[in-house]
Amino acid sequence: MRKLKSFTFIALTAFAITACSGSKDVEQRPEQELYNVGQTHLQNGDYSQAIRYLDAVRSRFPGSSYSEQTLLNLIYANYKTQDYTQTLVLADRFFQQYPTSRNLDYVLYMAGLTNAALGDNYIQDLFRIDRATRESSSIKAAFANFQTLVQNFPNSPYAQDALARMAYIKASLARHELAIAKFYAKRDAHVAVANRVVGMLQQYPDTQATYEALPLMQEAYEKMNLNDLAAKTAAIIEANKGRTFAEIEKPAEPEGLLKQ
């Protein structure tokens, strides 16, 4: 047992020495070398090592000629390692440090993808009634990121994909609202049904889910003896009869995200 402890101690000591020497190695390398090694790891898909070296560039050489590109690469590398919180922290730092950069559209796009990834669990749980009142700040933040990108950089290479993702988010949130309206309808919560569908008409007027929610609103008004409102809703349904909506699929994970 004593020998085993001895060998364990030696192994742990060796590991500690190796770890320290590795850390020292990064600390002592010149900027150009750190940056180049980080870029090599990035190109090879070794994102954790890329972050290690690029973080050293950023912390040891602030304000250098590599600073902006290093921050862009760190945003990408942290996104790829699914450290979404850090990705958003770095994106916010980029907006503050480089408010006039020609890469703002890229950072907005990456922020949108990151917030969308954080909101994925929300979208997957859209029809869980026990979560009916839950708000998702992440998925709405993603929509805002993409919307800002499209409005401010309409000619950006990321604009078309951002539009597609906005459409998907909008359709998903509308389906969620429809599920909630159906939930209330089954419980004869007529006021809640009407209010929910009115909100859908305001926020998601051009979606399949909103059109499908209109009969629920008409029925709710009828049961509350609000006949004028029920008739107006029926007229809207009739005016949109036969209208078709394109099926919106979730956009695939984009390729070529590394900003050179």
Swiss-Prot record:
GO terms for biological process: Gram-negative-bacterium-type cell outer membrane assembly; protein insertion into membrane. One of its GO terms (cellular component) is Bam protein complex. InterPro entries: BamD, BamD-like, TPR-like_helical_dom_sf, TPR_rpt. It comes from the Bacteria. A lipid is attached at residue 20 (N-palmitoyl cysteine). A lipid is attached at residue 20 (S-diacylglycerol cysteine). It is found in: Cell outer membrane. PROSITE patterns: PROKAR_LIPOPROTEIN, TPR. Keywords: Cell outer membrane, Lipoprotein, Membrane, Palmitate, Signal. It is a lipid-anchor. Residues 1-19 form the signal peptide. Part of the outer membrane protein assembly complex, which is involved in assembly and insertion of beta-barrel proteins into the outer membrane. Belongs to the BamD family. Part of the Bam complex. This is Outer membrane protein assembly factor BamD.
